[in-house]
Amino acid sequence: IYILAREAFDNNDDFKECAYVRTKELQENSNEYTTAIWTSIYKNSINAYNKVYARLNISENLNVYGESHYYKYINHVESLLTDKNMISVDAEGRKIVNITNTNPIIFEKSQDRGNSYTYGTTDLCALWYRSTQLKCEEIYYVVDEGQSLHFKQLFTVGKDAGWLTEQHQSKHVAFGILLGKDGKRLKSRDGRAPKLSDVIDEGIDYVTEMFATKNTNATDDKISKVAIGSIKYYDLSKSRSTNYKFDFDNMMQSTGNT
């Protein structure tokens, strides 16, 4: 859905205008129909995630707080930042959070973009919530290295606003990009970023063929464990902070570090 919506957003001005309106409605919970559609998508997404977690033997008992959880804190956080003279309106009519020695975070888009909030807005609300309400002393963001500047900005605002003190440890745990055999960003057969479930399925197909070639009988459970275990180990054996090639041929070698 996101891919189709992104394409329509980039190529259809009417769709783009509608998207700005719907986004603001979601953030303010001001349209029951819009919220109902989002709720349906959200539930289906969570169900899909849980299926992947189950395949990876990851607990489903997770405390999930997505962006929507923090919408109700936006006005409060805006007031806190305004009181500290950290918010201003730029030449384009956007509300921005001014940051020491770096570019600002856009807090609210301009009127021609629906006055909607950005993920920077909800990240600020999440940081405030985690540090002042949950009283978290350590906060880790496991996100790819391309977001390094964003988290530098985020943590600077947290410190300037007084949410992050010397007692807090906030860190961006950056990881590299997954590459294909050709050294380019890993993509599926249709040229898009692959889903983890697709990678697992491909691994299972590979192991199934490998056992068949060796005339080895194996249960579906064993095949699944070998495939998923190999994927996990291969990923964890690489340096977290650097890019690496994802190659089933190397991953399934019976010799070497596999």
PLM feature segments, named:
Residues 1-258:
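NTP-dependent nucleotidyl-transfer catalytic core
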